[in-house]
């Protein structure tokens, strides 16, 4: 019987094990870096400008949507479009740090390639009051804050004080005889809007329990009045996630036009100077009813969290006894928006309050245009079936 030469056998086995280990490691590396290796060997089949092209097309689409979606609420004496392309922009919401691009939650997106309102005007050939714009940009306020569970942060109304505005009115009037006032409000999923106002006015933080979030603050009212008393041609732009109380548009004769623009994305701001300058005609219609007083809606009774101490200590989901759960009671059923206001009018609910027109400022589907239209019935066909005509 021949004897096995163990050292040789062990040597061969060890060599095979080493080879297997190397192959296994190589396979692991190849698998981990497969996309990189494949791209190096055969390329990815994509244009090197793919991302830039896609972003450009997305920006064009966003602008086009806003051109067709912005609602012209008011246009006295056909003030818009204007041939004067020199503009003063008042209101912190119109500044580079104040302009809102998107809401929170699912409506949020990348901040890459954002076009501020001031840049939009400049890119389309307008001349803005740069001294005024710089003052707003360096006033120490910013709407670029992290989204939190704290309504005092998310829904803080940030604006400058009255002295900031009045001290710049004379210089602004010398620059141009027209002014644009921008009013901004944030919004998104997961939070009701507060029934009172958290404010940051030139760095001074306060709470106004007499006003809800979607009406002008005292400081905004003061700004509007000061600007309207100085300029004979004033435009108002609402950059808001939700509609606001807008009765003040009828208070000042110098407010000639008003536009409603919800969050327009990164490039939607381009639509504003194009509409105001007559490059496109606004054609948007309201998807909501705008009442003079939001408390006239039954949904107001149950909206918001009355106590934000409770709001911050409660849970989104919980089955533990004794823990608060965040909720809103929808007692109003379907009667929100035009469902409520049109039904209530039909039932005569507003008769003792001056009628429907005293309650509703802008009805569902409202929206003006630069174009004029005539209505003419060219023909009518009557189908008679039995004793009744259809």
Q: For each of these PLM feature ranges, what is it?
A:
Residues 1-390:
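C-terminal non-catalytic regions of proteins with extracellular/luminal or membrane-system context
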């Amino acid at each position: 019987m021949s004897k096995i030469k163990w050292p040789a056998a062990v040597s061969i086995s060890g060599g095979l094990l080493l080879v297997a280990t190397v192959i296994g490691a190589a396979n692991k590396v190849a698998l981990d870096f497969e996309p990189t290796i494949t791209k190096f060997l055969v390329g990815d089949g994509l244009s090197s400008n793919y991302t830039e092209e896609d972003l450009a097309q997305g920006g064009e689409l966003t602008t086009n949507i806003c051109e067709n979606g912005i609602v012209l609420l008011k246009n006295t004496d056909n003030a818009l479009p204007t041939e004067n392309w020199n503009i003063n922009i008042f209101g912190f919401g119109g500044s580079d740090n104040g302009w809102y691009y998107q809401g929170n939650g699912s409506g949020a997106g990348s901040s890459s390639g954002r076009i501020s309102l001031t840049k939009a005007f400049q890119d389309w050939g307008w001349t803005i009051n740069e001294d005024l714009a710089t003052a707003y940009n360096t006033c120490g306020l910013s709407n670029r804050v992290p989204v939190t569970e704290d309504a005092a942060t998310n829904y803080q109304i940030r604006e400058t004080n009255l002295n900031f505005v009045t001290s710049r009115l004379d210089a602004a009037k010398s620059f141009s005889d027209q002014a644009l006032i921008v009013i901004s409000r944030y919004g998104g999923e997961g939070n009701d809007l507060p029934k009172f106002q958290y404010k940051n006015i030139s760095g001074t933080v306060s709470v106004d329990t007499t006003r809800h979030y979607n009406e002008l603050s005292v400081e905004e009212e003061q700004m509007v009045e000061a600007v309207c008393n100085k300029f004979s041609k004033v435009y108002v732009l609402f950059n808001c996630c939700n509609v606001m109380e807008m009765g003040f548009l009828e208070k000042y004769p110098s407010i000639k036009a008003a536009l409603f623009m919800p969050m327009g994305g990164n490039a939607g701001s381009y639509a504003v100077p194009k509409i105001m300058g007559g490059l496109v005609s606004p054609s948007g219609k309201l998807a909501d009813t705008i009442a003079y007083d939001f408390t006239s809606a039954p949904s107001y009774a149950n909206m918001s969290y009355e106590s934000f101490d409770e709001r911050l200590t409660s849970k989104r989901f919980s089955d533990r006894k004794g823990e608060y759960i965040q909720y809103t009671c929808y007692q109003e059923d379907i009667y929100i928006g035009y469902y409520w206001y049109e039904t209530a009018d039909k039932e005569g609910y507003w008769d003792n309050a001056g009628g429907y027109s005293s309650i509703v400022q802008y009805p569902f589907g409202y929206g003006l245009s630069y174009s004029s239209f005539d209505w003419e019935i060219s023909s009518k066909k009557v189908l008679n079936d039995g004793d009744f005509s259809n």
